[in-house]
Regions:
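N-terminal Rossmann NAD(P)H-binding glycine-rich loop of SDR-like oxidoreductase domains
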Residues: 4-24
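Glycine-rich Rossmann NAD(P)(H)-binding loop
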Residues: 7, 148, 172-177, 204-212, ...
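NAD(P)H-binding glycine-rich loop region in Rossmannoid oxidoreductase-like domains
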Residues: 34-90, 96-98
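Active-site "gating" loop of Rossmann-like NAD(P)-dependent oxidoreductase/epimerase domains
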Residues: 93-118, 133
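Conserved beta-loop-beta element that borders a ligand/cofactor-binding pocket
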Residues: 128-150
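Alpha-helical substrate-binding/gating segment
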Residues: 160-170, 177-212, 219
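Mid/C-terminal beta-alpha module of Rossmann-like enzyme folds, strongest
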Residues: 193-245, 249, 282-284, 288, ...
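C-terminal amphipathic/interface module of NAD(P)-dependent oxidoreductases
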Residues: 247-298
């Protein structure tokens, strides 16, 4: 049993990660402001990561899982506030790759601004750069779109609600835009492998091996509920006004991940798990007005 610090621990990825390792028998601590209900099987360290002071100096962790680092300052403040620790794993983002890079994106490509992600991507990159200098043995993970139980972002839940209501689904263009996903449990499994095997590589793209078109992803969401899908092609409207992803076709080379973890959860299976969680936790999703835009403008 290890002693693990998870930053966050109250919503989606950080909550799932904390729960995953706690259920494995690890001694899990979560660092957050205590503004939301806590998991029952973790120890809370109440604090704002922007103002930690000496809250962490009395602790010694086998691993730090930094799920909520969005800026250089986030990483710098946490690293400086920690006492003794072993491994450090930061969940970064594929948004660090410029959209002009050849695809699939590989870990050895240059990183920089991406017009679709803006400051989110450049801030993640600055956080990565500081971490690599301050903690050379740290691991950095660059996922595409994460999904699965505890999802609070209105992505697959949006499609689920359209399917439940028997709505036609409004697809951007011909539906051929490709996206890549990674189940949050697979993220946890890969973190577990890093902690066990300590491979020499320090930066990993993570994700499903294959990208999927919008049309196929929506169909899988409808299939998860058992609802027939009828689509309407949309042109001439801003995509983010009526759809839950940017107008941005990209995917990652995840061969380094696959070498360590060959099996990942099939998207169809993962979406069924997502729907089962959503059915029981509808109030945990932050909704956006996609349906209202469609009904009023399309």
């Amino acid at each position: 049993m290890g002693k693990i610090l998870v930053t966050g621990g109250t919503v989606f990825v950080s909550r799932f990660v904390a729960n995953y390792f706690a259920q494995k028998g690890d001694d899990v601590y979560v660092l957050n402001r205590n503004s939301k209900p806590q998991l029952p099987n973790v120890t809370l360290i109440e604090g704002d990561r922007n103002d930690l002071g000496d809250k962490l100096k009395g602790y010694e962790f086998d691993a730090v899982l930094d799920i909520t680092a969005y800026t250089r300052e986030h990483v710098e403040d946490l690293v400086n506030a920690l006492g003794k620790f072993g491994d450090y794993i930061m969940v970064s983002s594929s948004a660090v790759y410029p959209e002009t890079n050849p695809q699939p994106f590989t870990e050895d490509q240059d990183c920089g601004p991406n017009v679709h992600w803006g400051p989110y991507g450049t801030n993640k990159l600055a956080a990565e750069e500081y971490l690599r200098q301050a903690v050379p043995h740290a691991y950095i993970l660059r996922p595409p779109y994460l999904y699965g139980p505890m999802q609070n972002v209105y992505r697959e839940p949006f499609v689920f609600e359209c399917a439940e209501a028997g709505r036609k689904f409004h697809i951007p263009g011909d539906g051929s835009m490709k996206m890549q996903f990674f189940h949050v449990e697979d993220l946890c499994r890969f973190i577990e492998i890093l902690l066990e095997k300590h491979p020499a590589e320090r930066v990993y793209n993570v994700g499903n091996l294959d990208a999927v078109t919008i049309s196929d992803w929506v169909r899988l969401c409808y299939d998860a509920i058992g609802t027939d899908l009828e689509t309407v092609s949309v042109e001439g409207h801003p995509q983010r006004a009526y759809f839950c992803f940017h107008d941005y076709d990209y995917y990652l080379d995840v061969s380094k991940q696959i070498a360590l973890m060959p099996d990942v959860k099939p998207l169809a299976e993962g979406l069924k798990e997502s729907y089962e969680w959503f059915r029981q936790h509808r109030d945990g999703v932050i909704r956006r007005s996609y349906m209202e835009y469609i009904d009023t403008n399309i």
